[in-house]
């Protein structure tokens, strides 16, 4: 698998949050994966209302938010290296999308936010990492590398460990 994180711009400013009650979706960019559709969303956690805008793709080699910096590298083996490379080559539009997301400046993200909230000011928003997942890459029924969207339970051959991968 390949680790991907979801990042959002967030504001806790009560004046801004009070003006938005709900969720507003935009339209996906050409070549962008379906889970990347930008949206503005009110969230309440522990009684604190916030407004989130995103998601933006983030990256770390960790499989979990608090995982090891070596997770990805420790998972690469001779038997899965070809699948990982093949999945990337077969999905160059997705790879390009991820690279451009990772290189996006704060200003560029703010410009996207202003399409939803024209009066939004950068000083009121900060970037958070909302979650971490592992994108499934495996051999398909035809033996060729595929990136699988959705979720899948993966377990060790001896059944002593299992995990849920995907989004």
Please tell me what each predicted stretch does.
Residues 1-69:
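Flavin-dependent oxidoreductases
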Residues 59-107:
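Alpha-helical membrane-targeting segments
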Residues 161-167:
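Glycine-rich phosphate/pyrophosphate-binding beta-alpha loops
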Residues 27-31, 70-75, 144-147:
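Short, low-complexity, polar/charged sequence segments that are solvent-exposed and flexible
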Residues 31, 46, 74-75, 135-139:
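Charge-rich, low-complexity amphipathic helices
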Residues 73-78, 112-114, 119, 167:
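Internal hydrophobic alpha-helix adjacent to the cofactor/substrate pocket in enzyme cavities
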Residues 32-37, 76-80, 153:
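Glycine-rich loops and low-complexity Gly/Arg-rich segments
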Residues 3-7, 12-14, 86-161:
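Flavin (FAD/FMN) cofactor-binding core of flavoprotein oxidoreductases
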């Amino acid at each position: 698998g390949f680790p991907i994180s979801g990042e959002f711009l967030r504001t806790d400013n009560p004046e801004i949050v009070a003006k938005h009650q709900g969720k507003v979706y935009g339209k996906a960019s050409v070549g962008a994966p379906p889970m990347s559709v930008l949206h503005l969303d009110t969230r309440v956690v522990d009684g604190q209302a916030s407004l989130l805008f995103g998601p933006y793709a983030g990256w770390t080699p960790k499989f979990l938010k608090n995982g090891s910096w070596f997770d990805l590298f420790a998972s690469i083996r001779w038997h899965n290296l070809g699948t990982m490379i093949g999945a990337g080559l077969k999905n160059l539009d997705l790879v390009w999308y991820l690279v451009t997301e990772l290189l996006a400046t704060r200003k560029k993200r703010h410009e996207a936010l202003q399409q939803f909230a024209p009066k939004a000011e950068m000083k009121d928003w900060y970037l958070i990492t909302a979650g971490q997942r592992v994108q499934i890459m495996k051999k398909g029924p035809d033996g060729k590398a595929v990136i699988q969207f959705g979720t899948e339970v993966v377990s060790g051959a001896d059944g002593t460990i299992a995990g849920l991968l995907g989004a």
